[in-house]
Curated annotation (Swiss-Prot):
Keywords: DNA-directed RNA polymerase, Magnesium, Metal-binding, Nucleotidyltransferase, Transcription, Transferase, Zinc
Function statement: DNA-dependent RNA polymerase catalyzes the transcription of DNA into RNA using the four ribonucleoside triphosphates as substrates.
Name of protein: DNA-directed RNA polymerase subunit beta'
Positions with a binding annotation for Zn(2+) 2: C867, C943, C950, C953
Organism: Chlorobium phaeovibrioides (strain DSM 265 / 1930)
Length: 1484
């Protein structure tokens, strides 16, 4: 940004901002004078001291149009400089703009460039930070030129000398001092900033670059190359920014009237010596003000103190130099000056920071005023205060229309006062502004009439903090109300997340015509009915409204007038008003249009009208001909509000049904009709909730009589488990898990029974059941606690490791109706308190996640219609996901553009051709077509737009169900869509009161529907064993890992459900069996992984030694010994190693099979014991995370995925397809080898104690985990590539949101963020480009760099080429070809060349924090985190910010380049026929 000489900053239409290090000339050019004195204001007159830090001569007058001495007053003297006091007569606002400077007695190093990591000065001079510090702080001398004395003494340039060594050389070579400093024979050594300044000034950057590149190419030492690369990056940054004699002329800016720019704006790039300052800029005094307090004291900005310290020390140093003080004193003063300047620029970095006198806190330096939440970027530039706003408490406004809000008169008159005054004066009611104000203050009745007219058609914005997504600010048409609270429509509460328990909201008035238009068209609440995160309605009725609609549309048999037939809706309403039919009575009404019903009326007919009668026969024929419908009076009343296009809604409306209906209305009849419908059902809902008199009493909560029986059964089962444990057949861990399972099942059975009793009570009209079933309030979980039993309670724990003991195994048997005992109450307080504390702690985490998401995605804008990519994303139909309640196939493809034709493989029909948008109808059709197993869709992940993304790859805008428009800020919408539910994710445990739910380990797996069994990769053995009762039992045991059972539809052959069968499961069906629904398919041990014998033979222990690799634990209660494998490393010497394993040997003693046994395994066989296939040899306990309700696992998991962190205990993954074999054993690790058919072999070292999933000889595919643990996303990227890791991240994050919180987020939002995480590549070989190896650069920049050398060649031998062409130089191919033609013609030696090499790179997965800091925009990165580091790097490299994203434009005060702020709209010119002028009217 360029400041003109002396005038205010140019309000130029700049398109980019360049960052560079200020040269001493530019500092002086910006300055209006030197600050010589440390004083601020005179203690008596309170006027600024001349030449002080507040001087009027330098910074401008403190009063408008008045000089310091008072000689010139008034605006007529504008621009005159007073001859007495030297102050220019101008406005006092210049004190915010004009700068001064302090001329330093000695050069001082800028702390940012010295202390940054890596140190910029250190990199240029090849000095460590420690050594630099000693030079800068005057501890040692550094040799600048060794000269002849240096050569004789063996001293080289940059050697450090102590004081003694320095003086020894000086005394030895006395005549050296007589030589001129520029003489190469003179020995020169200095210390402090002056030495660094000289060294940097004498630096040859080009020579340094050549030298460092040579090291990179030729050095074999990895360390040397890494150091050289680090230095080369800094050298190259300076070289690129430093282009001598390149002047920025008028043509490029158009800002200056003269031919050339003023001298200070001629930019020649960064010179290294600019990092050492000879003058310091003094910022304008209004930015570091002195504020008078009462009692004659002043509050001052910390910067004034820091400046004062610099000036005092600088002045003292000047004096000491003048009086030729001894070197020791001078040196100390110079060091103190350096420290004072360091403190001024960055006080927080110093260990001994300068502190204030009173409160002993570190002073806020210039860096601190930029950094953090209170810094310039985030406090003043990203968040600005606004005028024309107010705030008040909100109350419900049930009579408002959806687009209205109630604004208190007292607020409205304040907000619209200027407009009211203008109208009063215009209409002649008031003579002047003053009298109009008086009328308003008196609250004259005429004022209210004028106010009504003023606000008519003027929307206001309502905002509730925290504004987590765009629906947190909406526009409303205000209606004036009495009182002091704002009235809010009940249906918009969901979007604002508002309730009426004291919430406050802010009101803002859009002033300009454009702002009002935007508010009315885009932000009006009746236009924002759909949630951008999922495309589902957000203005959904809740609580009383849902209950009222549910009550209204419910049917009851045996009511007054049941079976009556009506001709029209009017007749029904008349009959109901005359009480001839009841509200819930089943009746028949004539209707021939569209009907939405989910029951067969002919089945219900027999219950309503007696079969065999004439009426029954007639009604049956009418129903079959679809002339009549069977419905209730309430449904007729409800359908009065439903638009005719939707048809007759003939079902009970609960919350889910209402949401679906509103979604249909929105897409079929548009927003206007939907808003009208919403207002109508709001009225109906409230009215019938009141009319039904639905309230809860204690007698409505019915405890099932069978509860006692079930509890007895559970107590009996838990006693049996304890007996087994006492017999030694169970470990303590298994006992605990089984007891928890018993109580969990019992709790669920009791809950289900209490729910069924409620359902049957009063024919389904039990108020508690109605509230629950309609979705108005409460959940099954709460009913379980009220009427069943509270069940098991989670023990509050910090970690989410799922350790045994996370659930207290003694359940709370009582429910809340019966009341809890003291002990039960005490146990349950645990969870309830944890829930509340979690809420407050986790909200901050979610907020921080949202901020990082916004920062990483803020510059993703739709910039073009179609990027023309041929790539797409394959979406598969996943049976497991669909049946486990995750997002269905149709949801994933709806609203996307197809990359290829979607074809039904059975019929060969094309359902959706390539390049078309998949509509709702298409999506439903695809979901129901078994022949479509996959669809290739366009995706943000594969979009090839150079900047932003294209409309086709994004698909439809979810909030309007139309293709996304160019200019839509999809990045911010994505960040809001993920961040907003993130805050809900955190507030989860709270509502369950800490009860433990979920986590029942199912031992039996049953068929979800009937079908034919199909085995996939299943290997079994037959096994017979004697059970507890002494009876022999035969079973089929699965010995293959990851086998599957598919349940296939017998008719269509479509896979209905896929089950993964665990190792060691007992099969209860055979391949080809036809199974019924709920038939058991297999049973398995959920709490442990089993190691099972696969062949006959005898057990032989290998490396299983008592006290070394296993311990014998005798259970004190049972007396049985349990053998557990332990971590043996601590028991052995460093050279020894062990690998506990079980071997099966045959009669000859030959080993037939080996099984490694991991740490913590429990052995179930003895050495020498005979085994048959299917025998359990050992069990590895599995930790179960049973505290399903606690989200603590959810948010950190999402953060871990977005930050692309390597999991704490990652799985080892194979990089190639092949077969597994085990290699040698080391002390702390063992070898696993994977070898493929081509002879390629990879060796992996697995830590001892880690459970190996693969067995000897197993076939594995690249990317398969060999050991247990989470797979690292970095491994997926390395082995399977960017597409695989992108889909992995999207799917994993989706799982957390769906399973933990049931939150629906459309995939495209996650794709936008994940795309940003993979925008960078790391350069491997730079080829002949200007890139450096190891550089992290944008993918598009990498492609550009390669394109720049695509048409070029490298000269290998120059032949008789002109002198300007050298070997190894790059030239354009066509130039060389042309030149060679001429050389050949003249019989000269031609130029030999080879094609220029392009760079190579590999993709890099960055976490969102790193990605946000690595953004191309300097301003955006600086305002996010690590402000000083970002600015330092940008200044050194002379970076240019092209202002492409939203954040940087907000900061510089421009319109954001999204929506109507797009550049293409700014340059629009209307080209059309000039309108014919209207003929002038003739005088009558």
């Amino acid at each position: 940004m360029i400041f003109s000489q002396g005038a205010s900053p140019l309000k130029g239409d700049f398109s980019r901002i360049k960052f560079s290090i200020a040269s001493p000339e530019s500092i002086l050019a910006h300055s209006r004078g030197e600050v010589l004195k440390p004083e601020t204001i005179n203690y008596r007159t309170f006027k600024p001291e001349r030449d002080g830090l507040m001087c009027e001569k330098i910074f401008g007058p403190t009063k408008d149009w008045e000089c310091y001495c008072g000689k010139y007053k008034r605006v007529r003297y504008k621009g005159i400089i007073c001859d007495r006091c030297g102050v220019e007569v101008t406005t006092k606002s210049v004190r915010r703009e004009r700068m001064g400077h302090i001329a330093l007695a000695v050069p001082v190093v800028h702390t940012w460039f010295f202390r940054s990591v890596p140190s910029k000065i250190g990199a240029l001079l090849d000095l460590s930070t420690k050594e630099l510090e000693r030079i800068i702080y005057y501890e040692v001398y550094v040799v600048i030129n060794p000269g002849e004395p240096g050569e004789k003494q063996g001293i080289k340039k940059l050697d450090r000398l102590t004081e003694e060594q320095y003086f020894q050389i000086i005394t030895e070579f006395e005549d050296n001092q007589d030589l001129d400093d520029s003489d190469p024979a003179k020995f020169v050594a200095k210390m402090g900033g002056e030495a660094i300044h000289l060294l940097l000034r004498n630096l040859d950057l080009d020579a340094s670059a050549v030298h460092l590149r040579t090291i990179l190419k030729e050095s074999s030492s990895e360390q040397k190359r890494a150091d050289a690369l680090k230095r080369l990056k800094v050298v190259e940054a300076f070289r690129k920014s430093y282009e001598p004699h390149r002047k920025v002329r008028k043509k490029s800016t158009g800002l200056f009237p003269e031919d050339e720019m003023p001298e200070p704006y001629i930019y020649e790039g960064n010179k290294p010596e600019y990092m050492v300052m000879e003058a310091i800029p003094v910022i304008p005094p209004e930015l570091r003000p002195l504020v008078p307090l009462e009692g004659g004291r002043f509050a001052t900005s910390d910067l004034n103190d820091l400046y004062r310290r610099v000036i005092i020390r600088n002045n003292r140093l000047k004096k000491l130099i003048d009086i030729r003080a001894p070197e020791v004193i001078l040196r100390n003063e110079k060091r103190m000056l350096q420290e004072a300047v360091d403190a001024l620029f960055d006080n927080s970095r110093k260990a001994n920071a300068v502190k204030t006198g009173e409160s002993n806190r570190p002073l806020k330096s210039l860096s601190d005023s930029l950094k953090g939440k209170q810094g310039r970027f985030r406090q003043n530039l990203l968040g600005k205060r606004v005028d024309y706003s107010g705030r008040s408490v909100i109350v419900v406004g049930p009579e408002l229309k959806l687009h209205q809000c109630g604004l208190p008169k007292s607020m409205a008159i304040e907000l619209f006062q200027p407009f009211v005054i203008r109208r009063l004066v215009e209409r002649g009611i008031a003579k002047s502004v003053k009298s109009a104000k008086k009328l308003i203050d008196k609250k004259d009745p005429v004022v209210w009439d004028v106010l009504e007219k003023v606000i008519d058609g003027r929307p206001v914005l309502l905002n509730r903090a925290p504004t987590l997504h765009r629906l947190g600010i909406q526009a409303f048409q205000p209606t004036l109300i009495e009182g002091k609270a704002i009235q809010l429509h009940p249906l918009v509460c969901t979007a604002f997340n508002a309730d009426f328990d004291g919430d406050q909201m802010a009101v803002h008035v859009p002033l300009s015509q454009e702002a009002q238009l935007e508010a009315s068209l885009l932000m009006l609440s009746s236009h924002n009915l759909i949630l951008p995160q999922s495309g589902k309605p957000v203005t959904v009725p809740s609580q009383d409204m849902v209950l009222g609609m549910y009550y209204l549309t419910k049917s009851r048999s045996g009511g007054v007038g049941e079976g009556s037939v009506f001709y029209s809706r009017e007749d029904v309403l008349i009959a109901h008003n005359e009480e001839r039919v009841g509200l819930h009575t089943q009746i028949f009404i004539q209707h021939t249009g569209r009907i939405d019903q989910k029951f067969d009326p002919l089945r219900v007919l027999d219950l309503v009208v007696e079969p065999g009668t004439e009426k029954h026969t007639w009604l049956k024929s009418q129903l079959e001909q679809k002339k009549l419908i069977l419905t209730t009076v309430g449904r007729v009343i409800f359908n009065e509000s439903v638009p005719d296009e939707i048809g007759f809604i003939n079902r009970v409306i609960d919350k889910k049904g209402a949401k679906e209906l509103i979604g249909r209305l929105s897409s079929e009849v548009g927003n206007v009709e939907t808003a009208r419908f919403l207002d109508n059902i709001k009225q109906v809902g409230f009215f019938y909730a009141m009319k039904g008199g639905l309230s809860v009493s204690l007698s409505d909560a019915i405890v099932p009589e069978t509860k006692a029986k079930h509890i007895k059964g559970a107590q009996r089962d838990s006693t049996r488990v304890v007996k087994e444990y006492n017999r030694g057949t169970l470990t303590d861990n298994e006992r605990y898990n089984q007891i928890v399972d018993v109580w969990q099942k019992t709790s669920n059975i009791v809950a289900e029974e209490s729910y069924q009793i409620l359902k049957k009570d009063r024919a389904g009209f039990n108020p508690l059941y109605m509230m629950l079933d309609s979705g108005a309030r409460g959940s099954r979980e709460q009913v379980r606690q009220l009427t069943g039993m509270r069940g098991l309670i989670a023990r509050p724990q910090k970690s989410m490791s799922g350790q045994p003991g996370e659930i207290i195994e003694n359940p709370i048997i009582s429910n809340l109706k019966e009341g809890l005992t003291v002990l039960e109450y005490f146990i349950s307080t645990h969870g309830a308190r944890k829930g509340l504390s979690d809420t407050s702690l986790k909200t901050a985490d979610a907020g921080y996640l949202t901020r990082r998401l916004h920062d990483v995605a803020q510059d993703v804008i739709v910039t073009m219609e179609d990027c023309g990519t041929t790539r797409g994303l394959l979406i598969y139909r996943n049976i497991e996901e669909e049946t486990s309640g995750q997002i269905k196939f149709r949801e994933k493809i709806r609203g996307r553009v197809t990359a290829r034709d979607i074809v039904d493989t059975i019929t060969g029909n094309v359902i959706v051709p390539a390049g078309e948008t998949i509509t709702d109808a298409h999506a439903e059709l695809i979901q129901d077509t078994p022949g479509v197993e996959e669809a290739e869709i366009r995706s943000v992940l594969t979009c090839e737009a150079k900047q932003g993304i294209c409309s086709k790859c994004y698909g439809t805008n979810l909030s309007v169900h139309k293709p996304v428009e160019i200019g839509e800020a999809v990045g911010v919408i994505a960040a809001q869509s993920i961040g907003e539910p993130g805050t809900q994710l955190t507030l989860r445990t709270f509502h369950q009161g800490g009860t433990a739910q979920g986590g029942i380990s199912e031992t039996e797996t049953k068929a979800v529907n009937e079908g034919t069994v199909q085995f996939e990769d299943i290997k079994t053995v037959d096994h017979s064993a004697i059970n507890e009762d002494g009876v022999e039992e035969d079973s089929v045991i699965v010995i293959q890992k990851n086998g599957k059972i598919n349940l296939v539809d017998s008719d269509s052959g479509k896979v209905l459900k896929r089950y993964v069968v665990p190792h060691g499961a007992h099969l209860a069906c055979k391949a080809g069996d036809l199974v019924r629904k709920d038939q058991v398919l297999f049973s398995s041990e959920p709490n442990s992984t089993q190691i099972i014998a696969e062949i006959n033979g005898t057990i032989k222990f290998a490396d299983i030694e008592k006290g070394v690799t296993y311990k014998e634990e005798v259970d004190p209660q049972t007396g049985f010994a349990q053998h557990t494998i332990i971590n043996w490393r601590s028991k052995l010497r460093a050279t020894e190693t062990r690998e506990p394993r079980l071997m099966i040997v045959d009669e000859t003693g030959e080993v037939r099979k080996t099984y490694p046994v991991p740490i913590k395994s429990n052995l179930y066989v003895e050495d020498g014991q005979k085994v048959v296939p299917g025998d359990i040899m050992a069990k590895v306990p599995r930790n179960l995370d049973r505290s399903g309700g606690d989200i603590t696992a959810g948010l950190p998991k999402v953060t871990e995925l977005f930050e692309a962190r390597i999991p704490s205990d990652p799985a080892i993954v194979t990089e190639i397809d092949g077969y597994v074999s085990f290699g040698s054993q080391r002390r702390s690790s063992k070898e696993i080898k994977v070898k493929n058919d081509f002879g390629e072999e990879k060796v992996y070292y697995v830590q001892v104690g880690k459970h190996v999933l693969a067995n000897e000889g197993d076939e594995v595919k690249a990317g398969d985990p060999l050991t247990d643990g989470a797979v690292s996303p970095q491994d997926i990227l390395r082995i399977q590539g960017p597409n695989a890791v992108q889909q992995y991240l999207v799917n994993e994050i989706q799982k957390v949101y769906q399973i933990n919180a049931g939150v629906e987020i459309n995939d495209k939002h996650l794709e936008v963020i994940v795309r940003q995480m993979l925008q960078k590549v790391r350069v491997e070989e730079p080829g002949d480009t200007e890139m450096l190896p190891g550089d992290l650069i944008d993918r598009s920049a990498f492609l550009e760099a390669n394109e720049s050398v695509a048409e070029k060649v490298r000269i290998t031998e120059r032949g008789d080429a002109p002198a300007r062409m050298q070997d190894e130089e790059l030239q354009k191919l066509r130039d060389i070809t042309k030149l060679n033609r001429e050389l050949r013609k003249n019989g000269k030696v031609m130029i030999a060349y080879e094609p220029a090499l392009q760079g190579t790179s590999h993709p890099v997965l960055l976490g969102i924090t790193s990605a946000a800091l690595q953004t191309e925009s300097v301003i955006s990165a600086a305002s996010f985190q690590e402000t000083t580091k970002v600015l330092t790097d940008a200044a050194v490299a002379g970076k240019v910010d092209h202002l492409a994203g939203l954040k940087e434009n907000v900061i510089v005060g421009k319109l954001i380049p999204a929506g109507t702020g797009l550049k293409k709209y700014k340059t629009l010119r209307l080209i059309g026929e000039p309108e014919a002028e209207a003929p002038a009217k003739e005088d009558a």
